[in-house]
C-alpha cells in the first residue's frame, strides 16, 4: 500500500526538510502552491517561516479562503512554528491584520520565548511519540496561551503548551523537520491514515 499524499505549503520555510521527514514517515510529499492542488492531497503541512509574511503570501496566491475551507471540511493539517500561529484562532503579539487559517481553538503568543537570539533546543516528552524524548528546536517560537476544552496538549516547555492536537489538526511550536527525527511527522502521517484520508 502506498502512503498518503501529504502536501507541503511551499511558499516559505523548510519545505525540503519536511519532505524528507514525511518520506521517512511513509508518506508521499508534494509541494502545494495553488488552491487546486489542495484537492489532490490527503493532508497538509504548514512549515515555519515568518507568519505575517506567509499570511500575506496566502492572500497573494489566493490560498487563504481555500485553506480555511479545507480545514473546515476536515483536511488533516500539521503546522510547525509559524504553521501553529496560522492554525490558531487568535494571536497575542501579532499584527492586527495577521491573516489566520484557524481551526485550532487556541490563542498563541508570537515570539513567546524571545527573538532570534533567544532560540534554543530542548528534549520533550510528546504524547503519542514512543521512544526517547524528542529533540526540539525552537526558533522565535510561539507558545499556546489559551487552549479550548477540545484541544489536547501533547507537550510543554516550562508549563507552556508547545505541541497540541485537535481532531485532525496537529501543531508544534518547534521545528521537528530540522533534527533528522521523523517521529512527529510519523504521528501526523499515522493520524492521516487513521482518519481515512490516506490512500
UniProtKB/Swiss-Prot annotation:
Assembly description: In the presence of PdxS, forms a dodecamer of heterodimers. Only shows activity in the heterodimer.
Keyword check for Metal-binding: no
Residue stretches spanning the membrane: none
Gene: pdxT
GO molecular function terms noted in the UniProt entry: glutaminase activity; pyridoxal 5'-phosphate synthase (glutamine hydrolysing) activity
Source organism of this protein record: Frankia casuarinae (strain DSM 45818 / CECT 9043 / HFP020203 / CcI3)
Family statement: Belongs to the glutaminase PdxT/SNO family.
Pathway assigned to this chain's UniProt record: Cofactor biosynthesis; pyridoxal 5'-phosphate biosynthesis
Record-given protein name: Pyridoxal 5'-phosphate synthase subunit PdxT
One GO term describing the cellular component: glutaminase complex
Active site: 81 (nucleophile), 175 (charge relay system), 177 (charge relay system)
Amino acid at each position: 500500500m502506498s502512503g498518503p499524499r501529504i502536501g507541503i505549503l511551499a511558499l516559505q520555510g523548510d519545505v525540503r526538510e519536511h519532505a524528507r521527514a514525511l518520506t521517512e514517515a511513509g508518506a508521499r510529499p508534494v509541494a502545494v502552491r495553488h488552491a487546486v492542488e489542495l484537492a489532490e492531497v490527503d493532508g497538509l503541512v504548514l512549515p515555519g517561516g515568518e507568519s505575517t509574511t506567509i499570511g500575506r503570501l496566502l492572500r497573494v496566491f489566493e490560498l487563504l479562503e481555500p485553506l480555511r475551507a479545507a480545514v473546515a471540511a476536515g483536511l488533516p493539517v500539521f503546522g510547525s512554528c509559524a504553521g501553529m500561529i496560522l492554525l490558531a484562532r487568535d494571536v497575542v503579539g501579532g499584527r492586527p491584520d495577521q491573516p489566520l487559517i484557524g481551526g485550532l481553538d487556541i490563542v498563541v503568543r508570537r515570539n513567546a520565548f524571545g527573538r532570534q537570539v533567544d532560540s534554543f533546543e530542548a528534549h520533550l516528552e510528546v504524547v503519542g511519540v514512543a521512544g526517547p524524548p524528542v529533540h526540539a528546536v525552537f526558533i522565535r517560537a510561539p507558545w499556546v496561551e489559551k487552549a479550548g476544552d477540545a484541544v489536547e496538549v501533547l507537550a510543554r516547555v516550562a508549563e507552556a503548551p508547545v505541541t497540541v492536537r485537535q481532531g485532525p489538526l496537529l501543531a508544534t511550536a518547534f521545528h521537528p523537520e530540522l533534527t533528522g527525527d521523523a517521529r512527529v511527522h510519523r504521528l501526523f502521517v499515522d493520524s492521516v491514515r487513521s482518519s481515512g484520508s490516506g490512500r
